[in-house]
């Protein structure tokens, strides 16, 4: 298990590289060029600037999250080929700084969806919250307004330039079915996987968050069966999944440890976090401790350990604790606590395995 930490870049993150360096066991940054809109080529010059920053603290840049996929590709429009060519060029460029994994998603219009970025919990901390009834009855334009007005930082998937065309985007998907989206995803993969494979990069799709349709938009990476269907699209070694325990885990029917055990050899990158699911379908993001949520994080880590997982991991979202002012879900303190919880579990399983061998 190789521990990483998501970082949004200088002047775009409340967490510094100096602070990340002090978290035990973190060896690399999960990074992106967050000022580039979907469809643009990532310039090598800009990529090298990030590498220089990472090199000062001894971090690798093995994991990219995310090179966003342009909506025209998801929609299957004639213009998609030009954007796919740009995507290929970005793959080539990130390979030049040692990238090994590109995490991406294929969610239409919206990335991850929440109704409250700072929902107060019983202990006084705040966390990302999803209120099902609110989403079911809310105009998506209102959610856009609330999310963008409350955010101190631009959030991935909720960039102003992306949401400026919300009306056009929603209308474009009115007649797009899940089968259409699968077809468009396969077309994209057939074009980019050979380039990724040539450069030793694994394309690892992130599950839909939450793992069901929102605002009538199609979503397809939502379950164990969907993961199976996705992985069957290609037998390329560059074709894999970013297994996010919190995204898939928001649906109690998804058995995360079971999914890991079944597909572990196709998981180059893992997001490990916990969510507490309520009977009405709401969920809130909690600490990594199994008892605090609905996902058995101890068994999640055990599933990785017993299968000899050597891929990359990050703690994913955290609560906002100790009065930290930070990007929603991406503060320093709770993610650092999460890392230590994950290491504690991993070390315990390592010790147990050694005792069995002796």
Curated annotation (Swiss-Prot):
Enzyme Commission no: 4.2.1.8
GO biological process: D-glucuronate catabolic process
Keywords for this protein: Iron, Lyase, Manganese
InterPro entries recorded: Man_deHydtase (IPR004628), Xyl_isomerase-like_sf (IPR036237)
Pathway in which the depicted protein is active: Carbohydrate metabolism; pentose and glucuronate interconversion
Cofactor(s) needed by this chain: Fe(2+); Mn(2+)
Gene Ontology MF annotations: ferrous iron binding; manganese ion binding; mannonate dehydratase activity
UniProt catalytic activity: D-mannonate = 2-dehydro-3-deoxy-D-gluconate + H2O
UniProt family annotation: Belongs to the mannonate dehydratase family.
Function text: Catalyzes the dehydration of D-mannonate.
Protein name per the record: Mannonate dehydratase
């Amino acid at each position: 298990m190789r521990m990483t930490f998501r970082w949004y870049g200088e002047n775009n993150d409340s967490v510094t590289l100096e602070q990340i360096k002090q978290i035990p066991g973190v060896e690399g940054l999960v990074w992106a060029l967050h000022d580039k809109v979907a469809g643009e080529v990532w310039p090598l010059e800009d990529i090298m600037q990030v590498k220089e920053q990472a090199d000062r603290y001894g971090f690798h840049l093995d994991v990219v999250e995310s090179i966003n996929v342009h909506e025209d590709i998801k929609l299957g429009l004639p213009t998609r080929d030009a954007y796919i060519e740009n995507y290929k060029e970005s793959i080539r460029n990130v390979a030049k700084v040692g990238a090994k994994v590109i995490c991406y998603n294929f969610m239409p219009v919206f990335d991850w969806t929440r109704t409250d970025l700072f929902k107060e919990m019983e202990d006084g901390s705040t966390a990302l919250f999803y209120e099902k009834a609110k989403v079911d009855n809310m105009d998506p334009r209102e959610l856009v307004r609330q999310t963008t007005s409350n955010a101190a930082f631009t959030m991935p998937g909720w960039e102003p330039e992306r949401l400026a065309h919300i009306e056009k985007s929603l209308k474009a998907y009115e007649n797009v079915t899940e089968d259409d989206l699968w077809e468009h995803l396969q077309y994209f993969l057939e074009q980019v996987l050979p380039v990724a494979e040539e450069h030793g990069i694994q394309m690892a799709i992130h599950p839909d968050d939450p793992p069901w349709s929102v605002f009538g938009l199609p979503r397809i990476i939502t379950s164990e069966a969907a993961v199976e269907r996705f992985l069957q699209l290609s037998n390329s070694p560059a074709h894999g999944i970013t297994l996010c325990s919190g995204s898939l885990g928001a649906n109690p029917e998804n058995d995360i440890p079971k999914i890991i055990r079944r597909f572990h050899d196709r998981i180059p990158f893992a997001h490990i976090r916990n969510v507490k699911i309520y009977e009405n379908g709401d969920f809130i993001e909690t600490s990594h401790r199994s008892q605090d949520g609905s996902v058995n994080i101890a068994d999640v880590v055990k599933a990785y350990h017993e299968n000899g997982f050597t891929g990359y991991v990050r703690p994913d979202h955290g609560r906002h604790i100790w009065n930290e002012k930070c990007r929603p879900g991406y503060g320093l303190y709770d993610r650092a606590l999460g890392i230590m919880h994950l290491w504690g579990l991993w070390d315990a399983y390592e010790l147990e395995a050694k005792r069995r061998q002796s």
